[in-house]
């Protein structure tokens, strides 16, 4: 005969096995749970924890959208760099003096975050912001 303490232990082991083994068999039959049923956070929550420059999905999407808009504005040779707008070579069809009135796409594109994409796209045709204390005549 089994001692009472051992009997309690065996019942606990049997209860644990009867609740886990069918779950494991169902898991193998159905595949792993998807979405919120898996107990993991959604991908959007994970990507929201990253900041600019980390390659988060929303930053890649914003960069692609801006590249599309800028290619329509400046032509197919438009690309994003880390250089300031004043360092970029204007398109070949722009005459001297006119490039100062073009939008600063690169300077504003690097500052885009999340829902600001629409604002940045709408501001593309505005004149570049002037530094304080300096005025250029065209």
Swiss-Prot record:
GO terms for cellular component: extracellular region. Its main location: secreted. Keywords: Secreted, Signal. Isoform 1 is highly expressed in small intestine, testis and kidney, medium expressed in brain and heart and low expressed in colon; it could not be detected in liver, adrenal gland and pancreas. It is found in: Secreted. According to PubMed:16515847, this gene is only represented in primates genome and it is highly conserved. Also found in bats (according to Ensembl). This is Putative uncharacterized protein IRX2-DT. It comes from Homo sapiens.
